[in-house]
Amino acid sequence: MEEEDARVPTLEPFRVEQEEEEYLLRQVFNAPKPKWTQLSGRKLQNWGGLPHPRGMVPERLPPWLQRYVDKVSDLRLFGGLPANHVLVNQYLPGEGIMPHEDGPLYYPTVSTISLGSHTMLDLYEPRQPEDDDPVEQPADHQPAPQPRPPPRPTTSLLLEPRSLLVLRGTAYTRLLHGIAAARVDELHATSLPPNAAACPSARPGACLVRGTRVSLTIRRVPRVLRAGLLLGK
């Protein structure tokens, strides 16, 4: 197995202090209303530009975000190049996001700072072709087939407030990731998350109640339109 393929999700030695967390949350919630986009199960802000297959039109990041983009870039997660895009997500208790992949518009590494509350990030194997096979219709007087159960995550990571998670290698390019729409996460002694040793709250039998969580997803968009192209030069 190649080194890149062996990489797994990690919690980097990067920590946001409580005062910094409070400052960042104030900046997020003080953003102009037009900056917010409401989706099913979350709302978000886009900073740095809107990624597009033909190239992202770059926008200057505000100083309060640029400081943390620089700190993450100093970890050299993006091939030695700086991050240039931040997606801010807000999740209320009971909200989540379906399993998905971030796709080819980004450098194959994603870093996420969690603020305000913990969550559980679920990782899934990609769907197989047989998962999409149509269900056969039952013959007359035969019981209807049972619906296929929803996919089960292969593992789940505890993301504590003020931590930085990094997904790269096959964890980014192959696995899907999502957040279950839950209000409480129960940690059982027999199934603690694999990163439990790095999480003070990951105690056997713990019942972690979710609050409002804000995530700063910091990435690099490789394809950026130059100013000359925008002006038609």
What are the residue ranges of the model-derived segments?
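Non-heme Fe(II) oxygenase metal-center motifs and adjacent flexible, charged/small-residue loops
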Residues: M1-K233
